[in-house]
Amino acid sequence: GLPVTLVHRLREHLTGLWRRADAQPERWVVVDTETSGLDPQRDALLAVGAVAADADGIRIGDSFEVVLRHEAAGDAENVAIHGIGWGAQRAGIPLADAMPAFAAWVADAPCVGFHASFDRTVLARAFAAAGAGAAPARWLDVAELAAALHPEQHKRGERSLDDWLARYGIETASRHTAAG
């Protein structure tokens, strides 16, 4: 699990954020996307991975993962990063099916992400392209939260997800997959 000091500081900060809201959410959704590049305004959404969390922790059994169907092969260098090859993309789920399914799974839960504006922008474009209505609207950016909680680390230029994971001793089995 997360170190106790991180959990305590996150709870304090999140409680303050949601104090202004009508009710504190019971379910949060941690979201990550994989794309065909680094431009959220231009590049294609390849995969969405998400897992629910609540006051008791991460709920692995309450998760969502989808690889989207694409008709054209992606860039080989990009595939080397995220591992979603041409076969997986060709066998993926159509955007018009995936985005409504994701919306139904998220429901009214706020979304959490690292550099969440990227994921939010990519998902908004995908929802629009799928004719699936509005993408999830409530987001918390953990990169901004981490910088607010530890400005000294942010000022030193230690701003990547890997930097923050190292600070808190959090190990991850895989990176650069939407679910990992």
Language model regions located:
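Conserved non-catalytic scaffold segment of RNase H-like nuclease domains
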Residues: 7-31, 35-124, 128-129, 134-136, ...
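Short, Lys/Arg-enriched N-terminal segments with co-localized hydrophobic residues
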Residues: 1-4
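Acidic, divalent-metal-coordinating active-site segment for phosphoryl/phosphodiester hydrolysis
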Residues: 180
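Short alpha-helix plus adjacent loop in nuclease-associated cores
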Residues: 140-156
